Structure formats: C-alpha cells, structure tokens
C-alpha cells in the first residue's frame, strides 16, 4: 500500500535477500514452520499443507544457501536465518501498526520522530486511538489531565503551553513527584517564568509532537501537515512495551537536541 511505502522510507533499506525470502508462499510457509520448531520432511509436508515435491524443492534451495541445515532426520534454521525471520516479523508488525493508526499518521508530521523509534513502531501495536468530535472538542485534553492527576512520575515533550497541564505538573512537583519536560524553544521563556519544572530543556520549534509518559501510560499526539496540532486524535497505551517505546523516544529525542 502507498501509505506503507511512505512511512517505511526511514526504515533503512531491506536487503534483497530478505525480499527474496518473502516473495514465495511455499518458502515463507516452510521458514515460518521451522521458526517454531525443527521438523522432519514428513512433518513439514503435513504442517504446511504443501505437496512433498514442493517442500522438497524448497528445502533443497534453502539448504544450498545455508539458510537451513539437517541434523539426523530434522531440519533446523541457521542462526542468521532466524535473525532474518525476526526482522520480517517485525516489519509485518510495523505494517499492521501503520494500517491500524492510519488516521493519525496520514497527513501528519511523522518525520520528526527519530528513525530509531520509527524502526520499533511495532512495539505500540496494542495502543488505542482516541478520537474526538466537535461536540467533545476537549476530550483529549481532559484525558491528559486525568492521567497527569494519577501520575507518580512524568516525562513529557511539550510543543505548546497549556495552562491546565502546567498547573497539574506544578501540583505533581509540589507533591515531590519527578517531572522532566522538553519544550519547544519558542515557549521556553513561558515555562521558565510560569512553571515550577526544574528539569527543563528545549528543542527547535519545527520538531513538533506531543509525548507524555507516566508510570502507567504513554500518550502521543501529532501535528498536521498544516502546522496545527491535531486536537482530535491521540495514541494512548498502558502496555509495557509501548511505555518503554515512548521512554526510548523521549531519550532519543533529548539526545538529538542536546
């Protein structure tokens, strides 16, 4: 799909070897089956549903390339092939994630997200997309205020100043809760004057996205191509992998802006 091609541009080039592995159904079936467990030729034929001749031909070609090897009566994936299969599985997860969240990725500024985090997008595959309508214009802001109210630790990237968020972050600091913020450089002066956040740094204003991480949840908001923040959509997740992804995104972004 076009959107997949577009968003995978920054996911560094996939080798021709990996492309070759994925363009044959019989090859994929055999490799996926061996990825789970070593198998005999008989078991492979039964498990894949392919004909014996098809399995035999595929196995012979894979063995010649060193992708698999035989020990006694069973076939095993080589270590390098196991790594390639894991790469393919990760790519598949990324594509599924892109399709699932197309509404928040399409026509939004996603190029500001560091490549290291783009390459691990599959980790947020279990996230949820919150969308609001005109009749509930403040839904996403209310949600953010709710999670901040329950937070025991906060890391955030703030591209704009919103008084209610600042008030809640100040309240957390008064209660001895750690808050670290990276803010857009065009509002740094406001935070320095109005906020109690001491662990504060800034980034160039053309690198816009909203990220809030607490001990329980991650929240990601993006800007639209017209330069305005999308007030109608947020990606949220309480999944541990997604929270870890968000923490890594925060650190990658901070390191890029030192």
Describe each model-derived feature in a short phrase.
Residues 40, 126, 132-137, 232-239:
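Intrinsic-disorder/low-complexity, polar/charged segments
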Residues 15, 101-180:
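PLD-like (HKD) phosphodiesterase/transphosphatidyltransferase domain
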Residues 2-36, 43, 47-70, 89, ...:
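PLD/PLD-like phosphodiesterase catalytic module centered on the HKD motif
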Residues 37-38, 74:
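Residue at a beta-strand N-cap/secondary-structure junction
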Residues 70-92:
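Basic, amphipathic "hinge/linker" alpha-helix immediately C-terminal to the N-terminal HTH DNA-binding motif
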């Amino acid at each position: 799909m076009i959107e997949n091609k577009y968003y995978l541009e920054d996911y560094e080039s996939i080798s021709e070897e990996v492309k070759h592995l994925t363009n044959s159904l019989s090859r994929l079936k055999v490799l996926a089956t061996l990825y789970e467990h070593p198998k005999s030729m008989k078991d492979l034929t039964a498990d894949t549903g392919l004909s014996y001749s098809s399995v035999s031909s595929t196995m012979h070609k894979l063995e010649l390339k060193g992708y698999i090897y035989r020990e006694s009566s069973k076939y095993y994936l080589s270590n390098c092939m196991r790594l390639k299969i894991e790469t393919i599985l990760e790519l598949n997860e990324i594509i599924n994630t892109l399709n699932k969240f197309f509404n928040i990725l399409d026509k939004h500024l996603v190029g500001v997200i560091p490549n290291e985090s783009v390459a691990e997008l599959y980790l947020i595959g279990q996230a949820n997309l919150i969308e609001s309508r005109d009749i509930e214009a403040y839904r996403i802001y209310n949600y953010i205020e709710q999670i901040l109210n329950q937070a025991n630790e906060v890391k955030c990237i703030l591209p704009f100043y919103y008084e209610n968020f600042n008030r809640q972050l100040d309240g957390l600091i008064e209660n001895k809760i750690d808050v670290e913020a990276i803010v857009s450089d065009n509002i740094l002066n406001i935070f320095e004057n109005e906020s109690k956040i001491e662990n504060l740094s800034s980034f160039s204003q053309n690198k816009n996205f909203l990220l809030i991480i607490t001990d329980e949840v991650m929240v990601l908001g993006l800007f639209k191509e017209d330069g305005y923040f999308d007030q109608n959509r947020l990606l949220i997740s309480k999944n541990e992998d997604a929270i870890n992804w968000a923490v890594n995104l925060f650190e990658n972004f901070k390191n890029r802006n030192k």
